[in-house]
Swiss-Prot record:
GO terms for molecular function: host cell surface receptor binding. The gene is HA. The keyword Isomerase does not apply. It comes from Influenza A virus (strain A/Ruddy Turnstone/New Jersey/47/1985 H4N6). The record marks 343-344 as: Cleavage. Palmitoylated. In natural infection, inactive HA is matured into HA1 and HA2 outside the cell by one or more trypsin-like, arginine-specific endoprotease secreted by the bronchial epithelial cells. One identified protease that may be involved in this process is secreted in lungs by club cells. Homotrimer of disulfide-linked HA1-HA2. The keyword Transport does not apply. The chain crosses the membrane at residues 528-548. It is found in: Virion membrane; Host apical cell membrane. Major glycoprotein, comprises over 80% of the envelope proteins present in virus particle. The extent of infection into host organism is determined by HA. Influenza viruses bud from the apical surface of polarized epithelial cells (e.g. bronchial epithelial cells) into lumen of lungs and are therefore usually pneumotropic. The reason is that HA is cleaved by tryptase clara which is restricted to lungs. However, HAs of H5 and H7 pantropic avian viruses subtypes can be cleaved by furin and subtilisin-type enzymes, allowing the virus to grow in other organs than lungs. It is a single-pass type I membrane protein. This is Hemagglutinin.
Amino acid sequence: MLSITILFLLIAEVSSQNYTGNPVICLGHHAVSNGTMVKTLTDDQVEVVTAQELVESQHLPELCPSPLRLVDGQTCDIVNGALGSPGCDHLNGAEWDVFIERPTAVDTCYPFDVPDYQSIRSILANNGKFEFIAEEFQWNTVKQNGKSGACKRANVNDFFRRLNWLTKSDGNAYPLQNLTKVNNGDYARLYIWGVHHPSTDTEQTNLYKNNPGRVTVSTKTSQTSVVPNIGSRPLVRGQSGRISFYWTIVEPGDLIVFNTIGNLIAPRGHYKLNSQKKSTILNTAVPIGSCVSKCHTNRGSITTTKPFQNISRISIGDCPKYVKQGSLKLATGMRNIPEKATRGLFGAIAGFIENGWQGLIDGWYGFRHQNAEGTGTAADLKSTQAAIDQINGKLNRLIEKTNEKYHQIEKEFEQVEGRIQDLEKYVEDTKIDLWSYNAELLVALENQHTIDVTDSEMNKLFERVRRQLRENAEDKGNGCFEIFHQCDNNCIESIRNGTYDHDIYRDEAINNRFQIQGVKLTQGYKDIILWISFSISCFLLVALLLAFILWACQNGNIRCQICI
């Protein structure tokens, strides 16, 4: 009973203590109830006040025709457009930054193949324009303008608009053709020509008389010679024969020679190549809309200022880097330490060592004070601005470090080049893995710097106040100072703005500091004494209970029997 009485007396004594009257000023920083988790170099989960998402995961469900010029191939791919297939007439003279090939594009003329399809496709796409220059070719004693039922234009037999099918003359003659074209211009010329492969020997002689035929095309630096491959093939649009298309680039001052005794699909002119143009091609089913975006993917356009995206690895234009991560957050505020609901028994103010302040909305750092005139809170704009200046532009610097304007297009290969395709995919996957790792490391590094900077500014502000107050106040260890002289609101303001004069209050502070006072219990000591008192009370209660049991056993009131 004695111990319980002591416990209640201690609680009553502690509870009766009031604020000592000495002014207190605390330094703190902004906090929010729910911060954002970011990753740093040393910790995967650090809570900060604010952060910005760096990975774009949203895209438009359409392709934007501005500012990049888009040309929709519709039912035509770019090679059929260059050949002049029926249904591709809308591409005549077309000019583009991005040529849109549709997965539904189909061949609409005589069945053909291109042995080096990917190269000619890339050349045409990069050129950015179908600028065809017609030329006069003098073919002797042969019939020109051959047509096919597989190549209908307005339900009439026709052929590729940019090519001339040469067959034997009505007099059953196909003499040796040898024709030269000199490039006297100031640009490179692209000639597309072909070789017809009949399905039978009879077809060969009916069309060209000579069996076998031969086609040789030469420049000063190259020569391509093709002998037709006669043989039956599966019917495509009613045709068992095939055409193989080839291409030759003739530089200024060079010349091209066509030599044939049959089977030549001759050009009607050439395409002007623009070495300065850097256009490209995109294969997608996404429709063209009316939006504005500099970045296109096969899933749609992206409108963002974020440096990374995880929408598609296939992207064209001024696009964010593709990374595997779905989220990378850049810290744009300080470390978040949410404010406690209550502080000890009396709700005394506390500084940044214990927690942040959710009410500090005008700045990142600030002061709280308690004096005879009451309590107050004020932001410190100077330290706030110093931290903001170091963090501002962080996103721009991050974008500059990843500011490679590029397009990443999925490569297409013939089946025979499967090993090259596997190697290409491995290289691309490795590049993406590397970029993803670099992005994560770069963001973690910037986040570490942000947290270090904001912590440093808090410490600088604390040291500035400590140097001002010196022995006029005592550091309480929680980010607060207890001031040993009278300090009204004007005095508090002088501490905040750095104009506090230590010498004015020095004598008063020294007298108060060394004045003999009773024992003054701080909040931490009160809690300790309460726990000690509680422990002693429990111990005394147990001891009294044991003493009672022993006394009862001795008097025979309680019998204790132990069985083994």
